Amino acid sequence: MNPLLVRQAIEYAVLLCDKYNDRIVITINGSGGMGNSTEIRPYCDEGFCFDPSLNAIIVTRTEGKTFIDTDSIKTIHCYKQKI
C-alpha cells in the first residue's frame, strides 16, 4: 500500500482513538490471505505508530513490538468498539 495512504490512515485512527476514548479496533490485513491480519486494540494498552524511516507500522504490546511493512498492507479498517 502507498506509504502516504498508510500514514493518513494511521493519523485518522489516532483521531478516532481520541474521539472515542481509545474504544476502537484497528484491523490491518496483509498480503498473506485471510489469516494474515493484525488487530490493534488501544483500550488494551496496545499502541501503534507509523515510522517513515522504516516505512512500517510499529505495533506495541505488552509482549513486545511488531513491525508491519507498508508494502505488505492491503487494507486498514477502524471499528468503534461497543461498550
Where on the chain are the PLM-derived regions?
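Phosphoinositide-dependent membrane-docking surfaces
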Residues: 69-78
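Short acidic, Gly/Pro-enriched loop/turn segments at secondary-structure junctions
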Residues: 62-63, 77-83
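A broad structural signal for short, well-ordered beta-strand segments within beta-sheet-rich domains
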Residues: 21, 25, 44-45, 73
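Short glycine-rich, low-complexity segments
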Residues: 1-36, 82-83
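Acidic, low-complexity, intrinsically disordered interaction modules
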Residues: 27-66
